[in-house]
């Protein structure tokens, strides 16, 4: 619950959801589903920092030439940064509206209905 609460607070601060306080309060989307990407959500909750942080451990190699590690990032760092950007590009290309279409096709109507009723009982 604590993680979910913090995530929803972050989504509210990023203007992805609106918060309503009080006994009948809750959260709702602040934007249309086609205006929210998965990257918007991830960056709101986790931040915009790269998923890979290079510690330049090769600089600890006692056999390296003096400025060898300062000329360019190592191959591992470059690959990881490229992978991070590919991940972000994919998340940027998928919107909440895409998820709605996918779930509507994959989840039977009776499960949607029972889930909806379950939520209503607890609202």
Where are these regions (language model features)?
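Beta-hairpin "wing" of winged helix-turn-helix
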Residues: 15-30
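C-terminal regulatory/oligomerization modules of transcriptional regulators
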Residues: 37, 50, 54-123
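Charged, amphipathic alpha-helical coiled-coil/dimerization segments
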Residues: 26-46
């Amino acid at each position: 619950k604590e993680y979910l609460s913090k995530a929803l607070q972050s989504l509210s601060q990023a203007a992805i959801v609106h918060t309503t306080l009080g006994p009948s309060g809750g959260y709702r989307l602040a934007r249309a589903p086609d205006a929210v990407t998965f990257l918007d959500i991830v960056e709101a909750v986790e931040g915009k920092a790269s998923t890979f942080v290079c510690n330049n451990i090769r600089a600890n190699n006692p056999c390296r030439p003096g400025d060898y590690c300062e000329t360019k990032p190592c191959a591992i760092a470059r690959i990881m940064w490229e992978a991070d950007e590919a991940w972000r590009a994919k998340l940027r290309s998928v919107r909440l509206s895409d998820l709605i279409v996918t779930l509507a096709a994959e989840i039977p109507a009776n499960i949607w209905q029972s889930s909806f009723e379950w939520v209503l009982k607890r609202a």
